[in-house]
Amino acid sequence: MSEITASGFSQPAIGTGPRPERTGPLAERDLLAVRFAGTGLQGVILMGVALAMAATRDHRYVAQTQTYGLGERGGYGHSDVIISDLPIDYPELETADLLVALCQDAATGYAGLLRPEGILVYDSENVTEPPAFAGSAFGIPFGRLAEEEVGLRDTTTIVLTLGAVVRIT
């Protein structure tokens, strides 16, 4: 069974076909809620859309929402992705299994959404005081790694951040 996508390419329908093995700490969840949060121009919307598209290629149901707010003017915005093995009843994120925070305001402002066993992944250059919570936290200097390894800070930061998220999920 296949379906035609907006791009015109045929791909297996959701829930059919082989699924790649997932090995990260959140891989075995039937429903996974992720929030990407940061300031304007950090790529949080693009990261959410990219993760949602990747999850559909993994034959999973996906809901993706985003809030721009004042993010494009220096405030912070977010992109939420809900990934499930079953149809999604409610597309808005209520609690998060994974919070990806690219700035201090986002980490502080959204940490309360994390489930007790949740995971916080943050940019350790921009989040100098990670919020305390019961789950696990991983600080990664995404921007510095991107610049040192590739020489391009902005776009490569998005790729590195998504790579960390894919490994966890």
Where are these regions (language model features)?
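Active-site cofactor/cluster-binding pocket
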Residues: 2-169
